[in-house]
Regions:
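Amphipathic, Lys/Arg-enriched alpha-helical "gate/interface" segment within cytosolic domains
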Residues: 1-146
Length: 146
């Protein structure tokens, strides 16, 4: 079970007891997702449905995912995102993923990148500054990860 809330700045947050997904449209066709906590699958397809709606609205999407606050993720969630990324390649211009300093998250994302067969469409960042620079290049302003 989870709650969905639209924040005053227009961001949308999906929140459960253990995890949150915050979606922020940085500009049309550019979406930032911040995931914090331990994702046990309580959101079902809701996160992917949100991203899919953005892709339909803007035709293509540059997708930034900040996973530096992730503590854990169950296999079915990882597998669902891997398959979703594989199937949605045509609508995704680029995917930037910030894993932060977690070896677990970096390894998990690296495996998912290979299994999704997306090639260099997915860029993995371990340094928050590099991630912020990638956002700035796309958006045109300086953005800082949480």
């Amino acid at each position: 079970m989870f709650e969905r809330e639209t924040l005053p700045d227009g961001a949308t947050i999906l929140r459960s007891e253990r995890c949150s997904h915050t979606f922020t449209r940085l500009r049309p066709g550019v979406l930032l997702l911040r995931i914090v906590g331990n994702d046990r699958g309580e959101f079902g397809d809701a996160p992917m449905d949100f991203v899919q709606a953005e892709m339909q609205r803007f035709r293509t999407l540059v997708f930034f995912i900040d996973m530096s606050g992730v503590e854990g993720v169950v296999s079915r969630v990882r597998e669902a995102w891997t398959e979703w990324l594989r199937l949605q390649q045509s609508g995704l211009t680029r995917v930037h993923m910030l894993t932060g300093g977690s070896r677990f998250v970096t390894t998990t994302v690296s495996v998912s990148k290979e299994l999704s067969r997306t090639g260099e469409m997915i860029q993995i960042h371990t340094d928050p500054e590099r991630f912020a620079e990638a956002i700035a290049r796309v958006v045109g302003t300086r953005a800082r990860p949480a």
